[in-house]
UniProtKB/Swiss-Prot annotation:
GO cellular component entries: apoplast; endoplasmic reticulum; Golgi apparatus; perinuclear endoplasmic reticulum; plasma membrane; secretory vesicle
Location of the motif SCOOP motif: 62-80
Protein function: Brassicaceae-specific phytocytokine (plant endogenous peptide released into the apoplast) perceived by MIK2 in a BAK1/SERK3 and SERK4 coreceptors-dependent manner, that modulates various physiological and antimicrobial processes including growth prevention and reactive oxygen species (ROS) response regulation.
Gene, per the UniProt record: STMP3
UniProt lineage: Eukaryota, Viridiplantae, Streptophyta, Embryophyta, Tracheophyta
Kinase as UniProt keyword: no
Keywords per UniProt: Apoplast, Cell membrane, Cleavage on pair of basic residues, Endoplasmic reticulum, Golgi apparatus, Membrane, Secreted, Signal
The keyword Transport belongs to this UniProt entry's keyword annotation: no
Gene Ontology MF terms in the entry: LRR domain binding; receptor serine/threonine kinase binding
Designated name of the protein: Secreted transmembrane peptide 3
Tissues in which the protein is found: Mostly expressed in leaves, and, to a lower extent, in roots, stems, siliques, seeds and flowers.
Subcellular location(s) per record: Cell membrane; Secreted, Extracellular space, Apoplast; Endoplasmic reticulum; Golgi apparatus
Signal peptide per UniProt: 1-27
Induction: Induced by drought, salt stress, ethylene (ET) and salicylic acid (SA), mainly in shoots.
Chain segments carrying region Disordered: 44-80
């Protein structure tokens, strides 16, 4: 019985140790990705002249047609 309890405790401590290691690795990766994403977001942001408001002030805005709705499929007729 004593050996079984110590092996369970050993397994539990190993599991917790691995969990802590993986959480630290995951934390460092997420901070790294946040640092990488920030400059990209700044570059993607459009300047005010390209926004809808800028186009309205600059001239007539081209009219965009709404997305066409998918045609409803005809229900198969069940003949008897």
């Amino acid at each position: 019985m004593g050996l079984k309890m110590s092996s369970n405790a050993l397994l539990l401590s190993l599991f917790l140790l691995l969990l802590c290691l993986f959480s630290e690795i995951g934390g460092s990766e997420t901070t790294h990705w946040k640092i990488v994403e920030e400059p990209v977001r700044g570059q993607i942001a459009t300047p005010p002249s390209l926004t809808c408001g800028g186009q309205r002030l600059g001239g007539p805005q081209p009219r965009l047609s709404p997305c066409p709705r998918p045609r409803p499929r005809p229900r198969p007729r069940t003949g008897s």
